[in-house]
């Protein structure tokens, strides 16, 4: 048995306990149109010391669609303090996706050597998320981050230029990844990761998936204007205290517990509520388009 860590030119690179094998899929898999993805646990038969054949894909614990990776246990959202400015709606979009999929969410704020912003830590710790402040300009990797990754299969997510590839390089110094600089003109990362790949971190017995930089992540299926609040942990249970109960969408209704209790008490950060409203509007537009 092994884990698919990379797809390249029609080959599946499978990490077993003793070797890294370059594999093709067995014919019955191709006929069944079953395609292994990065993160899959597979049954593999070695042909020699470096090549093998994938015979079966074991049942998946979960499957992320974007990035396409299977059997993930947590999502680490990497965001920069500056250059580029933190896109908190993107951070919250990823965290909502993690909540829907039942994955643990962690937020890592990179480039804290450029500008310390403790208020960002407070926003997400208040929501119950683990927040790590660090700098990727010098080794070794923050011990707090290694503790979070230990024994997990983690996906690194975040927009281009925030330092995901730099983080993987810091965790795995032997790797030769292209590190993206942020273009002064476009504020986008350059020369960044173009594919999903799992990297094994021997120091903490973990797998980390570096993902292509993106500026937008599609919301998972099943989200509605009624259940979106369930995926904001600080809003759990608020609806039962709203005047309109399950019909309250927390966007201006009279007697809304979120607006009359959570926000005034600072139990929910205004930035998170702003993200909620933005995502709520997006979900509403999706619902309207489905019923046209």
Q: What would you call each of these model-derived segments?
A:
Residues 164-180:
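A conserved segment at the C-terminal end of the G1
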